[in-house]
């Protein structure tokens, strides 16, 4: 059955799945549900597709991660984006460039060796290179202070809006429907146990609801009395004026990352685009993003990012004489551990979460595929436990989320040494003998909000973790 018109088509009153949110992740899920044979599915978006974080994204798609689950997501996304334009007829702007991740310390190279071994077991094409080999891949950089680099061969970038549109088009071609400019105002349960999604244009009754609300996912979750631990964090990226060296360059230019500054850098047209990750980061709209916010930049804070731009210029000297074409600042949703929230929501039947992703373009292909498997087949084909939203219980407060989300952004490029314990927002829950253990030199870790003693420092030994990839 259908009711009022929405986005040029009649709004269905009944569907099997309603996806809330038209960013790249929501559109990817819709696309992959149809690939598994579920075509009675709809997506509801309050504004235009890609009007949230997707609209502001740089479009980088990389396979680097220390997390095996995320590596599978990234790997699949690249495969999908390479093929999507030919399948749907919608341009995605995909470019295979490869990427370099620089190392200026031996600890960083140890990290790369650790990740390299994991990547090779997954069939990811990557290798370690010397400073001289790295310079051949990115000829505009100085190699002073470099120990080496890691090279991922198939990394690249895409047009976020074009890729999202391609996913939406592919889903529509298979029978799904997309309703833009139609905000969800509430959720309720029918006597049958089905969900009723109350939208501005009418109600849709469905079996399953997926919250892919992006920056608004916490507000959607609140409609079913669920607190979703995520916080928008400001992120700048800067485009330089056109550069003659780039204009005359033949072929693609390998993208560049220096995690010890940190920044990412890639070719954009005849120029270079850089995104720094500042330690003095700032949360935005901590009490919830306004429903009418869409496709808008946040105020630029040049003072906050200038030190990173100056360090970039030391690495790529030709940028010292380059002007700035534009600076953009936009919000990215971060969770307490920097990992997204993917899967069923505890205590709310047939309600799934697809939110809190700070690498949305990189991971969207994979999360759409594997969440679709979870919904249709009852379980995903890979282990997604590290992303399961049920890892955060009712102990996760707003103040904890604030502190830990900011920490997650600051430590985005932190050395991924196993057993590293983060400290923000702690302690949350302590056992009765916590004070006694602390007095005895306990060094604590945290699991599911609980403080637990990992080890005890002997007399004369400072009770501090000193972690390394080496013994």
Predicted regions and their residues:
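Glycine-rich FAD pyrophosphate-binding loop
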Residues: 34-54
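Helical element adjacent to the flavin cofactor pocket in flavoenzyme catalytic cores
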Residues: 150-208
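Central helical "cap/lid" subdomain
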Residues: 199, 203-252, 382
